[in-house]
């Protein structure tokens, strides 16, 4: 008989095993160590063990749903950080029960919406979430650049790029944040990860900004509408490439009319 417990009530090893087994046949091969799992999924991803649930068959963990709560774009939100079920335990209601616990937890904490991301091609998961009442609101796109010679120099004499501290970055970009940002790129997530921040200034006024880590993952890049197509964004990337000795760049973002 399958039993269900809060993840805060069990050993973290059981949570990790459920995650690892549930993603053992994922369409993208995932090799996540226990340490990386804890650091990422119970760190910047925002999941908390007390908001997460585990399915157990005796002393074997067979499914897990991770949950995290925060005010996301001014709405109290419960996000599903992952839902994973052991391949041998699919189709018998484990996912359904884990989701019921997840939803009830959200209601108990006054959340107004449920939120998650699912990869294109995982049709079984997409069908499951649609059946539960989820609706697609955004598409996430991911891009990589391995040939950084394509970041061409432009004549940007009037643009000065400066290193920023996180508090300055956070305050300065508020004037631009009138569009949807995905969970992994929002300010709360950025604050908990290791990043470098740059600002592009024209006559001491911020006209563009970049957040990038030392592996070249861009979490934020934005240029003021009146200063686009004159090399501001390119200048930010040039400086980051040179100072951080980057060999590649990657970025992911939702569809937007910006």
Regions found by a protein language model. Give the residues of each.
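A short beta-loop-alpha structural element at the N-terminal edge
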Residues: 2-17, 154-172
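Alpha-helical interaction/dimerization surfaces of two-component signaling modules
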Residues: 18-22, 105, 128, 132
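Acetyl-CoA-dependent GNAT
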Residues: 21-76, 81, 86, 167-219
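Conserved acetyl-CoA-binding loop-helix of GNAT-fold acetyltransferases
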Residues: 85, 91-104, 130-131, 229-242
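Conserved active-site alpha-helix within GNAT-family acetyltransferase domains
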Residues: 92, 96, 108, 120-138, ...
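Conserved GNAT acetyl-CoA-binding A-motif
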Residues: 106-117, 244-255
